[in-house]
């Protein structure tokens, strides 16, 4: 019998209320006198809580190698709005030296604070196309965290038991047939529902789900989306069908289901067969049940007419360096990021501890450690990808769309009203 870690209601509560995780490296205070004057403190504020512990551990190693540098990391996520939290940091005068931004929309919001990073080793090593979203002329305004992909993550053993071959699922009709088969065998499979749709999370539906249907409209180009005055919902009917399918066969009430419950309570404990998520969930699933994570987790593309068999793969976040910091601190921040992505210690952590798909040259990609990331890397290498255009949405428009999707699911808004209101809000934000 496989051993499973008990699902913690405390963890769930933290995720619902939002997560703000602060960590300090081992450098500590420098004390008084000359040592204090020589000490450089780098405060890092970032929005990816999944690797917070591993990131802090790596920062401590950097401090050991560089005793003149003290690194403090604050990770914000869960139900907390990262960008609002970042803006609060700047308005309060507690500006971080390094912070994360997601694509051109956020780069534009913080443009006055962005240091040109084109002279870094990391920028030189970045894979082709990974800097496009944060390049302005000759300037590189951010360095990619990693590559990520998402889709329909499924339980391999359940599919096999239900007689479903995942390789035969390409179209929406194929998927619907598989979902109905799983639903008809819920009792035999021991599941509560086929899906766990966390409709409480606006980003899951308004950013990730919607993106696969908007990407063809903007030629899979985040900058085309960023510069677009309007949006047409050209594949709106497909988007509606996919949202309806997930909701109809989901644990209910989906509108009160959050990310933590979806991943930890339902998928990791094998109470559902499919969830819409990405490779970033792997550390959480592994922590809950390592045997399940290593052997029974796969990923399928969300079906899009004309782009069947393609996964959305992109750069979720970029590191930015605060240009308002003093010259020594800016250089120290650049040095840390270069060490993170180009040193042997950093590269090992990126692959094995962070479990990232690297966005830089010089990595042994055969060592990508988790099965979801391996599959995503294979899709990317084969060119079977869909662009991440949601990073080019007008500021907070993904939340607007997500809120409208919530209204649609609660019968407070028709799909036609959803499209009309969302188009109106896009156009208003572009003025």
Stretch-by-stretch model annotation:
Residues 60, 64-65, 70-72, 162, ...:
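Extracytoplasmic/periplasmic substrate-recognition and gating elements
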